[in-house]
Each structure stands twice: as C-alpha cells, then as structure tokens.
C-alpha cells in the first residue's frame, strides 16, 4: 500500500464514530506520549488564538516560543480550514 493510499485509509478509519473512551484508546495506540502532548498543545494554541488572545500572551501563558504561536496563527488564517471547521462544530 502506498503512503497516499494508507493516509486515505487512515482518514476513513478516523471518520468512524467512536466514544470518548474509544478515541482515547485509539490515540494512545496510534501516537507516542510526545505526539499526543504536541497535538494537545497545538489544539490549545488554536483555541486561544480563536478566542482573540494576543500571541505574546499565549506564548507567556503556555511557556512556548512566539514562533510556535505564530505558526498556529498562520495555519488558522491560511490553512485548509480544518481548525476553523473544528472550532465551529465545537460551538454547536
């Protein structure tokens, strides 16, 4: 299976409806602790940016470099819209 096909298969697998417990088990099996921490950190950055908090304040609050926050801001503004869709769905 090519990487492209494997990625599509992964997307299909992730699309299946799961409980919070099932998601936790899947992510624990799929990702290393560091990868899970990085994803949670990135999501926290996106949520704070979307709330209107200034980048420097986020960097200070999370003890992260301003470049990490700027990257999150750039993806939120110029990315493919995945974060915006997720934020919108969470508000419902």
Name the predicted role of every residue range.
Residues 22-41:
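Short, Lys/Arg-enriched anionic-surface-contact patches
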Residues 1-15:
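General nucleic-acid-binding
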Residues 39-53:
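Short, amphipathic alpha-helical "recognition" segments used to contact nucleic acids or chromatin
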Residues 73-87:
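Short, solvent-exposed alpha-helical "recognition" segments
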Residues 57-62:
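Short alpha-helical "recognition helix" segments of helix-turn-helix
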């Amino acid at each position: 299976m090519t990487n492209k096909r494997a990625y599509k298969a992964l997307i299909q697998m992730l699309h299946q409806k799961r409980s919070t417990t099932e998601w936790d088990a899947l992510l624990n099996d799929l990702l290393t602790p560091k990868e899970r921490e990085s994803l949670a950190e990135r999501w926290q950055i996106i949520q704070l940016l979307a709330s209107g908090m200034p980048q420097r304040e986020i960097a200070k609050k999370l003890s992260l470099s301003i470049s990490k926050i700027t990257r999150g801001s750039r993806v939120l503004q110029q990315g493919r819209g995945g974060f915006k869709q997720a934020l919108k769905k969470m508000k419902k």
